[in-house]
């Protein structure tokens, strides 16, 4: 019995490695595609915009900071984007979400990719009972994603397009210091996985790609974790390329970096050992 289990584990790991390492992404397939990227002024969202720009896509970029968006726009045009339009918006506002989709459709004449990347500010600390912040974070990290996807879905259906959702390892395997953030990502996982079922049952051509990311070296992430974590962070540009590639390939899920997939796969096999291992990667001084 033990031999069979080990054999199947080996087969699964080999198959996963082959799946991860395959490289079938052709950037030319994204030329002239119409793309809306949220949270595009910095971090992974900024890098995602640059990868689409290199492929010659038409972009609508949205975030709260206009000056930062203008800088990203200039760089996108240098890299080869066909057009770049900006929408300054705060995703905590219900009206702003509808405005973003409406302006994107007006500027682009339709939509092929909706990339949901924005997040609300989240302190990296132990749970302190701040329910109000959690409520606000769910509004920005979860409900705004639903609002945007719902508004864009009829137009993505017309184009047989894709929804790309930036998620996190915390949506699969909870980690310390991220209680409210993890709750919002778990909610995203549940909603969009269920929506994928429903679209398939309705023969709707829209694909949904959930991007499960580990620790990425964005400025905001590095500032928050400081001396609280021992694991290495991975490049935002590489993570962004993996996101764009997975979306173009209409993958159900994408995991980056590579070890996130097996970590999620084995999460329920040895939960106590998993938790022990995770907790040893974090520092806590009471």
Swiss-Prot record:
Its EC number is 1.1.1.-. NADP(+) binds at residues 39-65, 90-91, 117-119, 181-185, 214-220. Substrate binds at residue 168. It is found in: Secreted. Residues 1-17 form the signal peptide. It is an enzyme of class 1 (oxidoreductase). CDD domains: 11beta-HSD1_like_SDR_c. It comes from the Eukaryota. Its main location: secreted. GO terms for cellular component: extracellular region. It catalyses: cortisone + NADPH + H(+) = cortisol + NADP(+). Keywords: NADP, Oxidoreductase, Secreted, Signal. GO terms for molecular function: oxidoreductase activity. It holds the Pfam family adh_short. The keyword Acyltransferase does not apply. SUPFAM superfamilies: NAD(P)-binding Rossmann-fold domains. The active site is at 181 (proton acceptor). Belongs to the short-chain dehydrogenases/reductases (SDR) family. Unidirectional NADP(+)-dependent cortisol dehydrogenase (in vitro). This is Hydroxysteroid 11-beta-dehydrogenase 1-like protein. It comes from Xenopus tropicalis (Western clawed frog). The lineage of its organism: Eukaryota, Metazoa, Chordata, Craniata, Vertebrata.
